[in-house]
Amino acid sequence: ITAREKDVTHQLLDNYDIPYTSRGKGKSSLIGKFFYLIKADLLLLRLAKIFNPDLFLSFASPYASHVSSILGKPHIAFTDTEHAKLGILSFLPFTDVVFTPEVYKSDHGNKHLRFSGYMEQCYLQNNYFSPNNNVLKKLNLKKNDKFVIIRLVSWEASHDIGHRGFSQGYLERLIGFIEQKAIVFLSVEGVVPTNLEKYKLFIDPTDIHHILYHAELFIGEGATMASECAILGTPSIYVNTLSAGSLEDQAKQNL
């Protein structure tokens, strides 16, 4: 396993005692992403020559696809993000099979296989996930306390360029309105504005899905958490100029 130092990825792997090699931090600019691509490819190539894998498996990883192609090994990719055009272009030509949800809106030809469901069901279906009530105590919440999760993303992915979510002013007004009726927690991928620090959600990242399950409402810029809430049965509002087939289908299904 190789993992980029992004958000809580390394912390999750550490908490589950899963061994991995860090690829370091990614970059936000296009030129920075290009040089990081070269760095990550070389790192993965070095590791692969030592480990000698029979198969590369990734979630839309250009690095895994490039190195698998160099070594003549098959690469299987999963993705559910149609609008990640640059990312798709970087891995698809070097990938043997790409799996997507059935409602994925793009077609990638003969190597494209679809499955009935959403990516988030791989870990949030009833046979994989059971909500834990103890997380409420960790947040000093009582069973009947109503709380809302607001999620802010970093906007550093290649497909985020030119797009945005909440403005600072709108976010402050939104929090002011919600906290008249419920407790507000901010889940933030980047830096929290200083005047909103008191709302930041401080938790063990392994608890996040239990917290989302118990939330009264989720409002966020992140598609993954919005989809997770749909699976968990928590009402969610997705705030983003980008959409995805999975989210649109979940809305149609009243999830």
Where are these regions (language model features)?
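N-terminal subdomain of nucleotide-sugar transferases
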Residues: I1-T2
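Active-site and donor-binding regions of nucleotide-sugar-utilizing enzymes
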Residues: E5-G109
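Catalytic donor nucleotide-activated moiety binding site of glycosyltransferases and closely related
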Residues: E5-K6, N15-K27, I150-L152, E172-D204
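Active-site regions of enzymes building and remodeling cell-envelope glycoconjugates
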Residues: Y16-S22, K73, N110-E120, T194-P205, ...
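Donor nucleotide-activated moiety binding/catalytic core segment of transferases
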Residues: A40-L44, E189-M225
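Structural motif
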Residues: D54-L55, V97, F147, I183, ...
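A donor-sugar binding/catalytic signature common to diverse glycosyltransferases
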Residues: L55-P62, V67, A77, I208-D249
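A nucleotide-sugar donor-handling region in carbohydrate enzymes
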Residues: F99-R164
